[in-house]
């Protein structure tokens, strides 16, 4: 993306951030009104999990190669990414993630980088075919464990089509709920209004979020999960920070206020002290990790792209569980929040070496 395009995107961010929240009409694509049940008592404990599934390779390397004037580096970068996808073996990793869901039993699971990868290089004389649907693989792994997690909502995000369509990647966000315990009253997935858009030939960066208004044991709980824009080599950091703040601000405005319990989770791609963080804190949300683990870093990102590091090499905390409406009268949040995929014992057997379940740690929070 050239400097002029970044400037246009920045103006769009500012204009969106300054607008009043849009009124949403019943029947529109973003209609989020659901029955709000305020039964007596209420559920004593709600468990949630957020996990970036990880596409399996460093896609930024491919984007950077496509963005250079030298076409000679495009295919080597793509070939390296495909080889890395094989080494990071999502069909094996999904078993570990499904096992963690089975062990912890969350009411809702927010998922990011839920990828659909379709590669067929046989027309080029290369005997390589990859066909992976991350969501279908996860649902199958959960069903094998006797679990009934249903897809409440998905959003369509990054879309990549290369080599004349022989290489395709579509990225989604998804929200799963345990259908045996959670009633979904309304749900939706949508793209954010502000996005980077096309950043290289065949590569369009769109980010989105998903939500569900639910009833659990007679009490209303809203779950939302998001994956705002990530840092991208060559893009101004300040612009990306403002894009993330605008994206999260849009989500907060459309979830709405009130006394209803809300859990907002995901790979939010920014750290404490960022504009994104300020938007959530200013809207009355509580950073659950910080509330329950004051003074503890709780880093969540990132393992090496090939997942080969023997000890976690995290250097930032960008995965979160934020809550509203769960605080006690004294302002405290009761429960627990832990990481998954952060210690060597979480690794599993890969095709060539031990690998991590994802390049991000997952979070599991129990809210009382």
Question: Where are these predicted regions, by residue range?
Answer:
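Solvent-exposed loop/turn segments at secondary-structure junctions
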Residues: 53-57, 114-118, 156-160, 181-182, ...
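Bacterial N-terminal signal peptides that target proteins for export
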Residues: 1-7
């Amino acid at each position: 993306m050239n400097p002029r395009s970044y400037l246009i995107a920045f103006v769009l961010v500012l204009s969106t951030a300054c607008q009043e929240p849009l009124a949403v009409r019943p029947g529109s694509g973003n209609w989020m009104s659901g029955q709000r049940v305020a039964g007596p008592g209420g559920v004593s404990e709600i468990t949630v999990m957020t996990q970036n599934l990880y596409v399996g390779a460093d896609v930024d390397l491919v984007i950077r190669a496509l963005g250079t004037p030298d076409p000679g580096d495009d295919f080597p970068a793509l070939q390296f990414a495909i080889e890395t996808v094989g080494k990071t073996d999502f069909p094996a990793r999904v078993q570990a993630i499904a096992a963690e869901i089975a062990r912890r039993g969350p009411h809702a699971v927010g998922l990011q980088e839920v990828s659909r990868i379709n590669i067929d290089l046989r027309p080029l004389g290369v005997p390589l075919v990859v066909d992976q649907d991350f969501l279908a693989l996860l649902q199958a792994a959960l069903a094998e464990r006797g679990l009934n997690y249903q897809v409440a909502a998905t959003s369509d995000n990054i879309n990549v089509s290369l080599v004349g369509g022989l290489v395709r990647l579509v990225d989604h966000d998804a929200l799963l709920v345990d259908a045996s315990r959670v009633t979904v009253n309304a749900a939706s997935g949508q793209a954010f209004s502000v996005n980077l858009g096309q950043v290289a030939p065949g590569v369009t960066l769109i980010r989105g979020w998903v939500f569900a208004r639910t009833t659990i044991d007679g009490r209303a709980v809203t779950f939302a999960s998001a994956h705002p824009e990530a840092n991208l080599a060559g893009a101004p950091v300040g612009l990306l920070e403002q894009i993330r703040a605008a994206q999260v601000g849009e989500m907060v405005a459309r979830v709405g206020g009130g006394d209803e319990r809300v859990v907002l989770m995901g790979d939010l791609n920014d750290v404490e002290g960022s504009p994104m963080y300020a938007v959530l804190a200013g809207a009355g949300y509580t950073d659950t990790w910080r509330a329950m683990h004051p003074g503890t870093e709780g880093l969540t990102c990132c393992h090496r792209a090939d997942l080969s590091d023997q000890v976690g090499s995290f250097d930032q905390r960008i995965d979160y569980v934020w809550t509203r409406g769960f605080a006690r009268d004294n302002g405290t949040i009761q429960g627990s929040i832990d990481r998954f995929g952060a210690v060597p014992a979480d690794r599993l057997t890969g095709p060539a070496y031990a690998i991590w379940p994802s390049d991000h740690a997952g979070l599991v929070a129990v809210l009382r």
